[in-house]
């Protein structure tokens, strides 16, 4: 495999698996995580056989009572856990003390964030991370191709 072979195979994202999301002033393009799992499975085989991940989890307690969960995710490939890449961290707020609210899915979401970051460094969905799928221009281009992937 040449240096760019994997990257070139996995860098393009099917627009039907992305969406624009926003949290306050922060806006970005989100990729469906199940689509990402399918994409890496297409390249390396079934999870647990051709590829997989290891993760660590840490809970960080802040002075104001908030708690964050951080997961470090490493990907291994070729059924050889010695061929490992990472860790890449994902972080989510687990407990919001001000609202007295627990985010039960935060640990899972932190792992998903770490997995997405790890995959991005291998070239998966590079078009998203390079900003090629952001904003109205992309949506208009896709509509012009007969695809109604607009946001």
Segments and roles (model prediction):
Residues 26, 31, 36-144:
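Positively charged, aromatic-enriched nucleic acid-contacting surfaces
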Residues 1-37:
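N-terminal, Lys/Arg- and Ser/Thr-rich interaction peptides
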């Amino acid at each position: 495999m040449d240096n760019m072979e994997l990257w070139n195979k996995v860098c393009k994202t099917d627009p039907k698996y992305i969406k624009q999301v926003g949290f306050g002033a922060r806006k970005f393009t989100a990729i469906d995580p199940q689509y990402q799992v399918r994409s890496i499975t297409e390249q390396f085989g079934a999870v647990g056989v051709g590829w997989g991940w290891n993760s660590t989890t840490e809970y960080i307690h802040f002075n104001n009572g908030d708690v964050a969960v951080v997961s470090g995710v490493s990907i291994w490939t070729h059924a050889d856990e010695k061929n490992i890449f990472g860790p890449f961290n994902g972080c989510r707020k687990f407990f919001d003390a001000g609202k007295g609210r627990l985010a039960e899915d935060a640990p899972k979401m932190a792992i998903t964030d770490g997995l997405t970051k790890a995959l991005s460094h291998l070239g998966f969905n590079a078009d998203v991370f390079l900003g090629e799928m952001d904003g109205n221009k992309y949506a208009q281009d896709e509509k012009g191709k007969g695809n109604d992937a607009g946001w």
